[in-house]
Amino acid sequence: MQYKQAGLPRWRGFNLLGMFTTRNEGWFPEEDFQLISELGFDFVRLPLSYRFWTKGGDLDSIEPVYQVNEKALESIDACVRAGEKYGLHININFHRAPGYCINPGEKEPFDLWKDEEAVKAFAWHWDLFAKRYKDIPSSRLSFDLVNEPLARTSSRARSTSGRSPQQCAPSAR
């Protein structure tokens, strides 16, 4: 009996965590993507922290959120290109976004669900990614706007309106 899945594709692959923190360079050798493909997998998820591609600075201010480190973005580009080269679907996932972090105890200066400044910064970053990757088809690249938005019960992390991801969805399409 042949099984054909309806709807969304069923991906099999790996999380590559090197861009989830600012403590490492976030670089993955192309050979990693080649090996993932040769082993029969077809998916790589990149859990990202926006702090990886911003220049840092005072977390009590929104200004550093808009200061982009182009070299860090180029390392994300390299992952997307390697995915294309080896037939891997790449998923870009914001684990940490302006005003939101899934990790307990991680300080964010604003609340994505309550502060308009955080919503604007969140949308600005997704617009940056949407423009950067606009020519790559959704069969090769997808976006997960915010990781597990309702997973934590903390009022600082829990969405009450769902408005923020909805505001960014048009950019990511």
Please name every model-derived segment.
Residues 1-45, 58-60:
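N-terminal carbohydrate-binding accessory modules
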Residues 16-19, 49-51, 95-97, 146-148:
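Active-site beta-loop-alpha junctions enriched in small/polar residues
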Residues 7-12, 40-42, 84-90, 135-141, ...:
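Short, well-ordered coil/turn segments that N-cap beta-strands
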Residues 20-28, 52-54, 69-70, 120, ...:
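Acidic-and-aromatic substrate-binding clefts and catalytic sites of carbohydrate-active enzymes
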Residues 12-15, 44-46, 76, 90-92, ...:
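Hydrophobic faces of well-ordered beta-strands that scaffold small-molecule active sites
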Residues 76-96:
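Substrate-binding cleft of carbohydrate-active enzyme catalytic domains
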Residues 104, 113-173:
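Active-site region of glycoside hydrolase catalytic domains
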Residues 52-72, 98-117:
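Surface-exposed, active-site-proximal loop segments in enzymatic domains
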